Amino acid sequence: MKPPISIQASEFDSSDEEPVDEEQTPIQISWLPLSRVNCSQFLGLCALPGCKFKDVRRNIQKDTEELKSYGIQDVFVFCTRGELSKYRVPNLLDLYQQYGIVTHHHPIPDGGTPDIGSCWEIMEELATCLKNNRKTLIHCYGGLGRSCLAACLLLYLSDSISPQQAIDSLRDVRGSGAIQTIKQYNYLHEFRDKLAAYLSSRDSLSRSVSR
């Protein structure tokens, strides 16, 4: 696949300038089965495509072409724009769109958690993608903290799954580093109560406005 015409070669490091890109390993996508929550789909998780930081030197166009070849239709990005610049992929969101991948950008600070309203928006968008059988991928920087938290929350929406079962499911596919901070761990455990309170207050507000 040729790179989109509107993307200038100078915006991305070319493989001619960095021969190491020729030898890079394929982007590693972990596929989380959602059968435990009565969904036949799999949710993809990965680290930041195209990342150039410290000893990581990936080629953004190759990674994006790989995602396209996997059939990815929707991607959820949890990196902030500051992170995208830091890791030298400032135009990643535009590139996804130019390759025909629907992009959902929900920035969450590294190691942090979303506010409950933003979290519910993410859950609704994820559920819609999966319900419509769209091949969906989520990523942050390392694909272990924020992405794994979002995937855990999606599982935990099911009454049949405990927080630890959700974490174990993610660690089965992403390794022991999944869910990286105490803040994320606590957020998961408190999620159902906070979500119930949020939805209740939202419904109350809606009723008062409609009167």
Swiss-Prot record:
Gene: Cdkn3
Cell compartment(s), UniProt: Cytoplasm, Perinuclear region
Gene Ontology molecular function, alphabetical: protein serine/threonine phosphatase activity; protein tyrosine phosphatase activity
Catalytic activity: O-phospho-L-tyrosyl-[protein] + H2O = L-tyrosyl-[protein] + phosphate; O-phospho-L-seryl-[protein] + H2O = L-seryl-[protein] + phosphate; O-phospho-L-threonyl-[protein] + H2O = L-threonyl-[protein] + phosphate
Protein name stated in the entry: Cyclin-dependent kinase inhibitor 3
Superkingdom classification of source: Eukaryota
Domain Tyrosine-protein phosphatase: residue ranges: 32-200
Residues of the active site: C140 (phosphocysteine intermediate)
Function as written in the Swiss-Prot or TrEMBL entry: May play a role in cell cycle regulation. Dual specificity phosphatase active toward substrates containing either phosphotyrosine or phosphoserine residues. Dephosphorylates CDK2 at 'Thr-160' in a cyclin-dependent manner.
PANTHER family recorded: TYROSINE SPECIFIC PROTEIN PHOSPHATASE AND DUAL SPECIFICITY PROTEIN PHOSPHATASE
Record InterPro entries: CDK_inhib_3, CDKN3, Prot-tyrosine_phosphatase-like, PTP, Tyr_Pase_cat, Tyr_Pase_dom, TYR_PHOSPHATASE_DUAL_dom
Stored Pfam families: CDKN3
Documented EC number(s): 3.1.3.16, 3.1.3.48
UniProt-listed SMART domains: PTPc_motif (SM00404)
Entries under PROSITE patterns matching the protein: TYR_PHOSPHATASE_2, TYR_PHOSPHATASE_DUAL
Assembly and interaction partners: Interacts with cyclin-dependent kinases such as CDK1, CDK2 and CDK3. Does not interact with CDK4. Interacts (via C-terminus) with phosphorylated CDK2 (via C-terminal helix). Interacts with MS4A3 (via C-terminus); the interaction enhances CDKN3 enzymatic activity.
Chain positions covered by the region annotation Interaction with CDK2: 1-34
Cross-referenced Gene3D superfamilies: Protein tyrosine phosphatase superfamily
Span list, region Disordered: 1-20
UniProt xrefs under CDD domains: CDKN3-like
One GO CC term, this protein: cytosol
Bridged cysteine pairs (disulfide): none
Family: Belongs to the protein-tyrosine phosphatase family.
Organism (species): Mus musculus (Mouse)
GO biological process, alphabetically ordered: DNA damage response; regulation of cell cycle
Keyword list, A-Z: Cell cycle, Cytoplasm, Hydrolase, Protein phosphatase
Principal cellular location given in the protein's record: cytoplasm
